[in-house]
């Protein structure tokens, strides 16, 4: 899988490529993007839109929401719901998606990680 460079795992001991090898369903992809150079913010949003146009058409895609940190923080959080890790693997290896990645500005750091819901009785359902 090609990643936006520089690529920084959220958990060094359990990187994204390893997560993609685990069968799980449904799941959420959280991708933290840090736009190190503020001048690259518009370019980041343009590249994100182009990649999202491909991702949102992939089998197994459920929904997506991009959030920007408040204040002057250069951090974005992308929350994507998928029906399975198999769907995420296929989408991230799609040639049309991979072709969009070089458009991300070089100062953008991506940190993807996969999650599943956890049940907490009385508060959260899984």
Task: Describe these PLM feature segments.
Residues 26-35, 65-94:
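Short, well-ordered beta-strand segments in beta-rich or mixed alpha/beta enzyme
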Residues 117-126:
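Short, low-order "capping/linker" segments at domain edges
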Residues 48, 52:
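Short amphipathic alpha-helical/adjacent loop interface patches that line ligand
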């Amino acid at each position: 899988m090609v990643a936006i460079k520089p690529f920084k795992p959220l958990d060094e001991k359990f990187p994204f490529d390893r997560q993609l090898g685990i069968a799980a369903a449904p799941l959420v992809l959280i991708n933290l993007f840090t736009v190190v150079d503020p001048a690259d913010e518009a370019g980041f949003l343009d590249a994100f839109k182009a990649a999202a146009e491909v991702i949102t058409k992939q089998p197994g895609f459920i929904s997506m929401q991009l959030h920007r940190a408040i204040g002057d923080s250069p951090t974005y959080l992308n929350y994507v719901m998928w029906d399975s890790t198999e769907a995420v693997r296929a989408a991230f290896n799609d040639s049309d998606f991979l072709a969009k990645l070089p458009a991300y500005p070089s100062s953008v750091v991506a940190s993807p990680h996969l999650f599943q819901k956890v049940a907490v009785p009385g508060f959260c359902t899984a």
